Design a protein with these regions (language model features):
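N-terminal intrinsically disordered/low-complexity leader segments
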Residues: 1-18, 157-158, 207-228
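Basic, helix-initiating cap at the start of DNA-binding domains
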Residues: 1-34, 39-47, 64-67
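Short hydrophobic/aromatic patch on the recognition helix
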Residues: 48-59
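Hydrophobic alpha-helical connector segments
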Residues: 68, 82-114, 165-172
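Amphipathic alpha-helical packing segments from all-alpha helical-bundle domains
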Residues: 78, 93-101, 130-155, 167-170
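Amphipathic alpha-helical segments used for helix-helix packing
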Residues: 94-98, 109-134
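Amphipathic C-terminal alpha-helical segment
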Residues: 106-109, 149, 153, 173-190, ...
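Hydrophobic alpha-helical segments that form the core
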Residues: 114, 119, 161-182, 194, ...
Length: 228
């Protein structure tokens, strides 16, 4: 009985992780440019150059693919664009301003506005599926929390003592989201700078105190009218 020659295992030619990344790249771009509902699996497979079997091995359903795009790509975009810069800034206000200005400058150089990746999908999918909505809401929550935590850090250093961290964070996120929606519609990144200036005026401690004073006067007037 002769010994069989040893056979070296052949070099692996397939790349599951590379394939998965390619599908995510294509899906992310299509969902942002065309929308989730307008992006068919057939179109995505053709653009990625994969078979149905290969696609479904990684993403059994279109919803699973959307969740992966949201949890891996959109969350990473918010982390890189917003959370990390705010955390690294000297203060929450400085961080928010730097993000607005950086995004506006990038859009001006780019020449077009595709919108906020999170905002785009939130508008389309929040009422379409509870799991997709929960994934999107989780990113919004982490975004607001990061800004609020930065305000609290400022307060520990003796700054922003008259600022409510959660309200400031909600206002910053809402202002940016709205500004990006308007900039996308108008194809004009200048809206971001306008909204940043308004945010600076409306979110300052002095403005907040003035607003509270106005609200108190309004309540007093209403009570006087009720007395008649």
């Amino acid at each position: 009985m002769t010994a069989r020659p040893k056979v070296r295992p052949g070099k692996r030619t397939n790349d599951p992780e590379g394939l998965r990344k390619r599908v995510l790249d294509v899906a992310e771009a299509s969902f942002q440019a065309r929308g989730y509902h307008a992006s068919s699996l057939g179109d995505l497979m053709a653009a990625a150059g994969v078979t149905g079997g290969a696609l479904h091995h990684h993403f059994p359903t279109k919803k699973a693919l959307a969740l992966a795009v949201i949890e891996e790509r959109v969350a990473a975009a918010v982390e890189a664009t917003w959370i990390a810069p705010v955390q690294a800034a000297g203060s929450a206000r400085e961080g928010v301003r730097s993000v607005f200005e950086a995004v506006a400058a990038e859009l001006e150089q780019q020449g077009f506005v595709r919108g906020c990746p999170l905002n785009n999908l939130a508008h389309e999918l929040s009422l379409a599926d509870p799991d997709l909505r929960a994934a999107l809401a989780g990113i919004f929550s982490a975004w607001r929390q990061a800004i609020a935590d930065k305000v609290r850090a400022d307060q520990q250093a003796g700054r922003e003592l008259d600022t409510d961290p959660q309200r400031f964070a909600a206002l910053a996120v809402a202002t940016y989201s709205g500004a990006m929606s308007m900039a996308k519609t108008a194809q004009d990144s200048g809206v971001l700078r306008d909204c940043l200036n308004a945010l600076g005026q409306g979110a300052s401690p002095a403005s907040s105190s003035k607003g509270e004073a106005v609200a108190k006067r309004r309540r007093r007037v209403l009570r006087q009218y009720k007395a008649f």
